[in-house]
UniProtKB/Swiss-Prot annotation:
Keywords: DNA damage, DNA repair, Hydrolase. NCBIfam families: 3mg, PRK00802.1-4. It comes from Wolbachia sp. subsp. Brugia malayi (strain TRS). InterPro entries: Formyl_transferase-like_C_sf (IPR011034), MPG (IPR003180), MPG_sf (IPR036995). It is an enzyme of class 3 (hydrolase). Its EC number is 3.2.2.-. One of its GO terms (biological process) is base-excision repair. This is Putative 3-methyladenine DNA glycosylase.
Length: 169
């Protein structure tokens, strides 16, 4: 596996660009590694599905922070979801990691952000971590270009019309 961690400037770009280019990259967490296969973009206070749509709160503070940090939150009283902050400090945007094809230590397809976090044991403890500095929790360059499709986001009640879900096919 390539050990080239994606640098901060990878995330300091428009969220839709980052989302598309995260596909095929390697997410590394603890002893797990996997190819990112599906993501969704959430962009700014004008995006009704974005947690930051209602403004700055303790929960969303990381989204207004430095790009390249993790944003982990709890949903439905049972699942955590992993996002990576994008764009510029002060502008709330992130990419939700929805799918992963595990390659280490075993092979498995993890479909859905809650299942992904449960299998990898990603919890609120992993919120607000810098993914550009640690080989334990990061995204590696893969130098693989894959074809993908853009579809409407799923599992949300507002902003469903935006084709901001990116998935390898």
């Amino acid at each position: 596996m390539n050990n080239e961690i994606l640098p901060r400037n990878f995330y300091e770009r428009p969220t839709l660009v980052v989302a598309g280019e995260l596909l095929g990259k390697i997410l590394k967490f603890s002893n797990f590694s996997g190819v990112i296969t599906e993501v969704e973009a959430y962009i700014g206070m004008d995006d009704p599905a974005c947690h930051a749509a209602r403004g700055y709160t303790d929960r969303t503070s990381v989204m207004f922070g430095i790009p390249g940090f993790s944003y982990v939150y709890f949903i439905y009283g049972m699942y955590y979801c992993l996002n990576i902050v994008t764009e510029t400090e002060g502008f709330p945007a992130a990419v939700l990691i929805r799918g992963l094809k595990l390659i280490e230590p075993l092979k498995a397809n993890l479909s859905g952000p809650g299942i992904l976090c449960k299998r990898l044991n990603i919890t609120r403890e992993h919120n607000k971590l810098d993914l550009t500095i640690s080989h334990e929790f990061c995204v590696y360059e893969s130098h693989i270009n894959l074809d993908y499709v853009c579809t409407p986001r799923i599992g949300i009640s507002k902003g469903k019309e935006k084709f901001w879900r990116f998935k390898i096919f």
